[in-house]
Amino acid sequence: MIKDPFARLGLEREVLTVSQLNGRARVLLEDVFSSIWVEGEISNLSRPASGHVYFTLKDSGAQVRCALFRQSAARVRQALKDGLQVKVRGKVSLFEGRGDYQLILDTVEPAGDGALRLAFDALKAKLSDEGLFSAERKIALPVHPQRIGIISSPTGAVIRDIISVFRRRAPRVELTLIPTAVQGREAINQIVRALKLADSRGFDALILARGGGSLEDLWCFNEEAVARAIDACVTPIVSAVGHETDVSISDFVADVRAPTPSAAAELLAPDSSDLHRRVDSLHRRLVSRMQDRLMRERLRLEGISRRLRHPGERLRQQSQRLDDLDMRLRRAFEQNMHQRQVRLAHMQSRLAAQHPGRTLGFLRQRLDALAERLPRAIREQIKARRLQLQSQAQTLNVVSPLATLGRGYSILLDERGHAIRNAAQTRTGQRLTARLGEGELQVRVEDNHLTPVTLSLLD
């Protein structure tokens, strides 16, 4: 306790400026209230772009400004909103520019039972999203367990109730207590260790049990570490935490949730009287089915005995069957021989029809006919070719140059025997040959104008 704060700040009744006053007041407040917890309701919540959070913390009689800077705001897990009842931790400071004092916060937590409820809902949503509550992860409870591990407090009514139920319903089931604290901060680690130990002991099933209590009393069963330890177990677990109205995270993760520890024991301890009744029922069903089976076998045996005859009768039947088979074999052989004979006769007739002698006679007749027709065909062919040749000769005579020469025309040929078609092809004094219809004349060109050429006959 500072008895003389003014002396500590060096104040000796001097006159201060406003800035000096606010500065020294800030130092004093931060020194005295360096870390305090305050509870109140959030109002006027503001989140500027800087990432800082500002709000007013109030109760029914007063209010104070609060600042939660960006790094501290990032560590707050709960969503802040107006009207939320919270507990905050920080230091008292003074904003020198306005002379307003405020709380500079480093921690914000929901207050009271509401805080626990918000934390419960947040963890429940998280584990549900990860699939820890899904039906596919649940392990079925054994029908007739022989060894059961109980994770609970060694004192109190819970363990006595569980043992009482098993003694009454299934006294032969072996029970093993894995003691652990079930309340307080130490309970979390103890429950996790007890779960790992029990899961390694090869029990048929486990019971995680605690009696009723407040939400705070049962909170260790709502911790994430306990939930994940339950999920990691390969042994089926029955969660029996609190009364029937109490619900914990452990109930959701466990394979089966029982409303009370006694109910959990009843789930794993089938009533011996019920078992006796079930055995009696199964015995009656077994006897009935055996009697039915004996009756069916007796009837079957009688049927077989009726079908069973004397060996002599069996021999007579076999002899008769052998005679029948012999007759059928003979008949089949005869039918086969007949079919083969018919087929052979058919093939002989086809072979006779295709004999070479018959084919040769037919070909000889055809050759004689062709030999008789050949001279006549040759004469007719020669006659037709002669007529065709005469017709072509007449046609050739009509278009032949010799026929033209026979009508008084002639053809002039130069020294190389080429026909002269134009006067320009000649020269004066050139010797030419004039071919007539009969014979030739040697001529000489006297003049070769385009006018008719003048020729003179050579001696």
UniProtKB/Swiss-Prot annotation:
Catalytic reaction annotation: Exonucleolytic cleavage in either 5'- to 3'- or 3'- to 5'-direction to yield nucleoside 5'-phosphates
Taxonomic superkingdom: Bacteria
UniProt enzyme class: hydrolase
Keywords recorded for this protein, A-Z: Cytoplasm, Exonuclease, Hydrolase, Nuclease
Entry's Gene Ontology molecular function annotations: exodeoxyribonuclease VII activity; nucleic acid binding
GO CC terms, sorted: cytoplasm; exodeoxyribonuclease VII complex
Keyword Cytoplasm: yes
GO biological process: DNA catabolic process
Enzyme Commission number(s) from the entry: 3.1.11.6
Keyword Hydrolase listed: yes
Compartments where located: Cytoplasm
Role of this protein: Bidirectionally degrades single-stranded DNA into large acid-insoluble oligonucleotides, which are then degraded further into small acid-soluble oligonucleotides.
UniProt subunit comment: Heterooligomer composed of large and small subunits.
Family to which this protein belongs: Belongs to the XseA family.
Designated name of the protein: Exodeoxyribonuclease 7 large subunit
Origin species: Pseudomonas savastanoi pv. phaseolicola (strain 1448A / Race 6)
Gene from which the chain derives: xseA
